[in-house]
C-alpha cells in the first residue's frame, strides 16, 4: 500500500500520508546515500559498504537495531562541515534520486494537493537525506529522524524519538496533536 488517506470530520482535514522509500522513489534513499558516500571515497569503502549492506538486510528482515544504525549512518555527518555535506547531498539528489522519482507518485501527490489535502511523508530515513527529496515533490510536512545540529555542525547523534516502527506512530500522534491546535 503506497499511502494512507485519512479524513477527520472533527477537524475537516483530509490527510494523505506517504512513505518515501520504494513508494515515492524506486529504491531506498538511506541505502543509496551510504553507497554514494562509499563511491565518492567519503567513507572507508570496506567497512562502510559491508556495514551498510548488513543494516539494510536487517531492515528488510525486520531485525534492525535503529539506534545502532543511526550511530552508524549519522557518523559521517559529524566528520565534515555542513557546507560540504550540503554540496554532496545536492550531488546525491541530482545523480541518484531524481532518476528514480516515480511519475505515478507525482501524479497521486498532485491529485491530493489539488483536492486541498494535507500531505505528509513519514520515513525511517533521516531528515538530512529525505528533506530535499520530499521538497522535490512539493510536500512540506515530513516526519523523519532528525540529526542533531549544534554550533553549525552535525554531531553524529539524533534528536528525539527515531522515526522507526513504533516511533513513527508516536511522532504521527504528536504531529496530529500539534496540527489540531
Each language-model region and where it sits:
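Short, compositionally biased "basic patch" segments
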Residues: 56-82, 141-147
